[in-house]
């Protein structure tokens, strides 16, 4: 008796996970294929379409505080509204996000403010 596609799908629905894993492994060995190739192709297509969309939200990342740690801490406090201890911890943990989900103009403005007090900043 020959199996058709429906018979195989019915068996797969009731099969245990390890049985399916064993089947996939046997198919890979028998026919010299890998199951990962199909998943990789779909991932490449979706990654390409994501690149074509323009980024609308930006994160301001403090890369380092440079030579003026105190001034950077003061500016981070002013920007974030954090207390002295939290701002100091944030600055010392660089590279660290200062603000996330900003518009491009707001992110660039914060970058300029932080660079004016000696910080090294990136907008991503």
Swiss-Prot record:
Signal peptide: none annotated. GO terms for biological process: translation. The keyword Ribosomal protein applies. One of its GO terms (molecular function) is mRNA binding. GO terms for cellular component: cytosolic large ribosomal subunit. Gene3D superfamilies: 3.30.1390.10, Single helix bin. Coiled coil: none annotated. Keywords: Ribonucleoprotein, Ribosomal protein. InterPro entries: Ribosomal_bL12, Ribosomal_bL12_C, Ribosomal_bL12_C/ClpS-like, Ribosomal_bL12_oligo, Ribosomal_bL12_oligo_N_sf. SUPFAM superfamilies: ClpS-like, Ribosomal protein L7/12, oligomerisation (N-terminal) domain. It holds the Pfam family Ribosomal_L12_N. Forms part of the ribosomal stalk which helps the ribosome interact with GTP-bound translation factors. Is thus essential for accurate translation. Belongs to the bacterial ribosomal protein bL12 family. Homodimer. Part of the ribosomal stalk of the 50S ribosomal subunit. Forms a multimeric L10(L12)X complex, where L10 forms an elongated spine to which 2 to 4 L12 dimers bind in a sequential fashion. Binds GTP-bound translation factors. This is Large ribosomal subunit protein bL12.
